[in-house]
Amino acid sequence: MISKWAKRFFQMAELVGSWSKDPSTQVGAVITKHNRIVSVGFNGYPHGVSDSADTDEREIKYLKTLHAEENAILFAKRDLEGCDIWVTHFPCPNCAAKIIQTGISKVYCPEQTEDFLSRWGEKIQVSQDMFSQAGVEVTWLPLDILK
């Protein structure tokens, strides 16, 4: 059974993700320690860079976008050793590297849909391998009890 804290932190990650101006993918991340929120982040352009959803082609948008995990790590401005991160989508390899490097010890993520796995399965496997090698615990949260 999922704890009330797990449900709350995942719901918060979803809420924070909804702040993204990206019309196709909204990702949220919440960093916690001992059931206290340390930082939050969502995917989007860096501060001061025009982020109108229709101004850039997809490839240019990808180059400019900070991922939710990156933003949460940057906004924290503190040591994240031993923290947990709650994400709406499984971290890409670049974000996995940053999570590992900061000392975050646990990643909580909802089970991924078949559609998501069909598009990102290879990158998910790379990230999972990185987390496993670095000793970062990954917990998959069942979708049906998160809502």
From Swiss-Prot:
One of its GO terms (biological process) is cytidine deamination. InterPro entries: APOBEC/CMP_deaminase_Zn-bd (IPR016192), CMP_dCMP_dom (IPR002125), Cytidine_deaminase-like (IPR016193), dCMP_deaminase (IPR016473), dCMP_deaminase-rel (IPR015517), Deoxycytidylate_deaminase_dom (IPR035105). Pfam families: dCMP_cyt_deam_1 (PF00383). GO terms for cellular component: cytoplasm. The keyword Metal-binding applies. One of its GO terms (molecular function) is zinc ion binding. Its EC number is 3.5.-.-. Zn(2+) binds at residues 67, 92, 95. The keyword Ribonucleoprotein does not apply. Its cofactor is Zn(2+). PANTHER family: DEOXYCYTIDYLATE DEAMINASE, DEOXYCYTIDYLATE DEAMINASE-RELATED. Belongs to the cytidine and deoxycytidylate deaminase family. This is Uncharacterized deaminase in luxG 3'region. The lineage of its organism: Bacteria, Pseudomonadati, Pseudomonadota, Gammaproteobacteria, Vibrionales.
